[in-house]
Amino acid sequence: SLHVGSEVVINGRVLHVSEIMYGVKNDGTGLEVVSNKLAQHSAGWQTCEQACYNSTLTVWFAD
């Protein structure tokens, strides 16, 4: 599994995980938080924490 410092390759570019946020709400509030964080990082992606509708998210950022 990925952790802070893990190497990731996105579109041929090598980056390192720099921040992970757990339990992010899957709604407008969560979107605002993620949008603000994306402005500070080179890349970001999300995974659902549960296999259900409107699951909270884990959001990963890399630089």
Can you describe what each PLM-predicted range is?
Residues S1-D63:
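Extracytoplasmic/periplasmic soluble domains downstream of a signal peptide or transmembrane helix
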